[in-house]
Amino acid sequence: MSSMEKNLFNLKFAAKELHRNAKKCEKEEKTEKAKIKKAIQKGNTEIARIHAENAIRQKNQGINFLRMSARVDAVAARVQTAVTMGKVTKSMAGVVKSMDTTLKSMNLEKISALMDKFEHQFETLDVQTQQMEDTMSNTTTLTTPQNQVDNLLHEMADEAGLDLNMELPQGQTGSVGTSVASTEQDELSQRLARLRDQV
């Protein structure tokens, strides 16, 4: 097995590993959602909010892993084509030297930078390339939008058949431009609450 074939194998393996990490995040998101329901049932709105933030963070992280998995997979396909056509250049071979440790680290920013180098090599070979995303550092965020948290809390409360009484200051506006969807969601939640009171 040539070093390029070995690196091709590593790329494919990394894509699968990233996909596996996305699945783990999905599982964690479901666990956090179950905890939201329990906290709401006990009337612990603050605890429910923490679990909602965790759930959204896991969801976003999972999406990032999926995106990077697809990107690595696409690069692997291009490497496969280059190997098959015998178009592996010296500069491309140079890029793969740091690949092993980068892929094993599962660090999205480092993998993204490595994919950038690969994609640059393919552009110079006139192999058509399409970047799926900019570096993942822009999308990996530690903060969670409050309207997403509020919507998830309401969604979980509705699924659990409970009324969520959140003390929100009057006239409080959400983060820049509250969406029509969240307003509609609030109206639906209020209607559901009224229907429950009538029963």
UniProtKB/Swiss-Prot annotation:
**Region spans: Disordered:** 167-199
- Please give the coiled-coil regions recorded for this protein: 15-42, 178-199
Motif window: MIT-interacting motif: 186-196
Primary location: cytoplasm
Give the top-rank taxon of the lineage listed in the UniProt record for this protein.
Eukaryota
List all Polar residues biased stretches: 170-183
Name its cellular compartments: Cytoplasm, Cytosol; Endosome; Late endosome membrane
Q: Which GO terms describe its biological process?
A: protein transport; vacuolar transport
Any Pfam family matching the protein: Snf7
Q: Which GO terms describe its cellular component?
A: cytosol; late endosome membrane
| Protein topology in the membrane | Peripheral membrane protein
| Keyword terms of this UniProt record | Coiled coil, Cytoplasm, Endosome, Membrane, Protein transport, Transport
Which InterPro entries does UniProt cross-reference here?
A: Snf7_fam
- Role: Probable peripherally associated component of the endosomal sorting required for transport complex III (ESCRT-III) which is involved in multivesicular bodies (MVBs) formation and sorting of endosomal cargo proteins into MVBs. MVBs contain intraluminal vesicles (ILVs) that are generated by invagination and scission from the limiting membrane of the endosome and mostly are delivered to lysosomes enabling degradation of membrane proteins, such as stimulated growth factor receptors, lysosomal enzymes and lipids.
Family to which this protein belongs: Belongs to the SNF7 family.
Q: What is this protein called?
A: Charged multivesicular body protein 1b
Q: Which organism is it from?
A: Xenopus tropicalis (Western clawed frog)
- Name of the gene: chmp1b
